[in-house]
From Swiss-Prot:
Binding residues for Zn(2+): 176, 178, 189
Residues covered by region (Disordered): 1-20
Basic and acidic residues bias locations: 9-18
Pfam families recorded: RadC (PF04002), UPF0758_N (PF20582)
MPN domain ranges (all copies): 105-227
Similarity remark: Belongs to the UPF0758 family.
GO terms, biological process: proteolysis
Motif extent (JAMM motif): 176-189
CDD domains to which the protein is assigned, alphabetical: MPN_DUF2466
Protein name per Swiss-Prot or TrEMBL: UPF0758 protein A1S_2918
Record-linked PROSITE patterns: MPN
Superkingdom field: Bacteria
Gene Ontology MF: a single term: metal ion binding
């Protein structure tokens, strides 16, 4: 039987907790419940949100689901589906504007990772990318340099370094994706990072980090102390 959120203790209601503690204090299902606003006769908004995430596997997958897939759930109709599409598009436009700024400052590893996830989203093959930064951690240029298969991408250290020098980079972040599976680095990934780090040191470019991004998460070489201590990691 549906227990209305209105009957919950105030400190447990998602909207009240969001206002008091901030959105980061809420789970994916609680945030989705605030968006849904109402559930169905059988389920509260939070219960419906949990069912949706369980069914589709993640919050992202809920937003990517078709109308026919979502309409199977009581409480989801054309109105809520159109709202989902609108919120998804608003998020995309926000990121497009934010990351297209010419003076984009990437002064923390969190911001760098967000930017790289944005640039590499949707790639179905391995892609190796380079982010060039100036001395103040402002973006100079970003480029996807090498493309491979689902499981492998051949990378040239010389071409990577040449590109960084052409952009007058003072600092560098490299990244590649694992389209499927774990973000854990392979022995080849570790060897490549070491080679690039050594090459960067020769031309006085600081390699700040190497990120691996996958559907299961991300891996930072700097955070795992797999870069030389003389390199300055993004704080």
């Amino acid at each position: 039987m549906n227990t209305s959120i209105k009957n919950w203790p105030e400190q447990e209601r998602p909207r009240e907790r969001l206002l008091q503690q901030g959105p980061q204090s809420l789970s994916d299902s609680e945030l989705l419940a605030i968006f849904l606003r109402s559930g169905s006769r059988q389920h509260s908004a939070v219960e419906l949100a949990r069912l949706l995430i369980q069914q589709f596997g993640s919050l992202n997958a809920v937003f990517d689901a078709s109308y026919n897939e979502l309409a199977q759930f009581n409480g989801i109709g054309a109105t809520k589906y159109s709202q989902l599409l609108a919120v998804k598009e608003l998020g995309r436009r926000y990121l497009d504007y934010h990351f297209s700024q010419t003076e984009l400052s990437l002064h923390s590893s969190h911001l760098v990772l967000d930017y790289l996830r944005y640039e590499l989203k949707g790639e179905k093959q391995e892609v190796f990318a380079v982010l060039c930064l100036d001395a103040e951690l402002r973006k100079l240029h970003f480029k996807k340099l090498f493309f491979g298969s689902v499981q492998h991408c051949a990378v040239s250290v010389n071409q990577t370094l040449r590109y960084a020098l052409q952009q007058h980079a003072c600092q560098l972040v490299i990244a590649h994706n694992h389209p499927f599976g774990s973000p854990q680095p392979s022995p080849e990934d570790i060897k490549l990072t070491q080679q690039l780090e050594q090459a960067c040191q020769l031309v006085e470019i600081r390699l700040l980090d190497h990120f691996i991004i996958s559907p299961e998460g991300s891996f930072s070489f700097a955070e795992q102390q797999l870069l030389n201590p003389t390199s300055i990691a993004v704080q």
